[in-house]
A protein has these predicted regions:
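Structured soluble/peripheral alpha/beta segments that form catalytic or ligand/cofactor-binding pockets
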Residues: 1-170
Length: 170
């Protein structure tokens, strides 16, 4: 909570946020073309992070995640605890890349439906990171009811991600 000043007027604000810090000893393992990553804040106060590192055929090299309960207890989710099933695709009119924007995420025998707030959330980072990818806001549904909201990142659908991209001279 705090204060936000807009046009010289102070307004009280309150909200929820998360800090995302990604690190690895390598960019992508051999055979991988990209990743699908999700961070969700659920309405019951819990939070979910789930990801998979993907081969060109769509199969997973790695699947992993964490589920933080409302009381702060954290549970690690391994390969067999998670499943990612794309349900609907969207093709970018700018890049021509086809992204799986709607998903069924399986978590230990239960599932969530992930729907984007809008399909067109493609980011063109060719001038900086060298990648075009889809990254945007999603809502999570269970049995047709909204149960959370979050962020989904989809990389490597246009071409495999590689280090050393970016603008000339970088």
């Amino acid at each position: 909570s705090g204060w936000l000043t807009v046009d010289g007027r102070q307004r009280p604000v309150r909200g929820v946020a998360w800090l995302d810090h990604e690190w690895s000893s390598e960019y992508l393992p051999e055979g991988a073309v990209g990743w699908d990553w999700l961070g969700l804040n659920l309405d019951d106060g819990s939070a979910l992070m789930a990801a998979r590192i993907r081969r060109a055929d769509g199969s997973a090299l790695w699947r992993f995640g964490t589920l933080r309960a409302a009381n702060g207890e954290v549970r690690e989710l391994g390969f067999d605890a998670l499943s990612f099933e794309p349900l609907r695709h969207w093709r970018s009119p700018r890049s021509g890349v086809r992204y799986p924007v709607s998903w069924r995420l399986g978590i230990d025998g239960t599932s969530l439906l992930l729907e984007p707030l809008m399909d067109d959330q493609e980011l063109d980072g060719r001038a900086s990171t060298g990648a075009i990818y889809w990254e945007g806001a999603v809502r999570a549904l269970r049995d047709g009811r909204a149960v959370g909201r979050g962020y989904l990142e989809l990389t490597g659908y246009g071409e495999a991600l590689r280090l050393g991209g970016g603008a000339p001279g970088r």
